[in-house]
């Protein structure tokens, strides 16, 4: 079975994280569950790799917190988006944290729809004609 790997890292200091990372975590979990269900029948296993950053690591480069990679490429590359930054909160020591800029909109937390879209684009690279030979009605699209 081929693997579609989603890697996400965020600041976690004494079990505390910022609101935007907390929201992204909820969104990535929803996307992960849907993607697992959709890709399993065509032989693609979805793997979610969550990583924690200490405050010391965060302080060296706050813009790598709340970052998602899909198949070792930043989500921004899949979506043709840009990364940005904006002031966050006291958990982050008021650092400027990562945002995504896409089609004139800035996202402080990453919505489920963008995660799914990027994963669909990545999955297209994994799909071979043989994988598409599934019985009609097997795939349930969300």
Task: Go through each PLM region and give its residues.
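Acidic/histidine-rich catalytic cores of soluble enzymes
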Residues: 49
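Non-globular targeting/processing and membrane-anchoring segments
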Residues: 1-46, 54, 58-63, 67-71, ...
């Amino acid at each position: 079975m081929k693997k579609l790997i989603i890697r996400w890292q965020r600041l976690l200091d004494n079990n505390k994280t910022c609101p935007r990372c907390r929201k992204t975590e909820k969104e990535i979990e929803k996307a992960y569950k849907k993607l697992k269900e959709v890709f399993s029948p065509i032989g693609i296993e979805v793997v979610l790799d969550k990583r924690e950053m200490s405050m010391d690591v965060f302080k060296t480069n706050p813009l790598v917190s709340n970052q998602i990679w899909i198949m070792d490429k930043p989500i921004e590359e899949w979506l043709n988006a840009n990364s940005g930054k904006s002031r966050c909160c006291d958990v982050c020591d008021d650092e400027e944290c990562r945002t995504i800029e896409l089609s004139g909109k800035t996202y402080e937390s990453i919505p489920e729809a963008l995660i799914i879209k990027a994963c669909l684009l990545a999955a297209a690279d994994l799909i071979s004609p043989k994988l598409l030979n599934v019985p009609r009605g097997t795939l349930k699209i969300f």
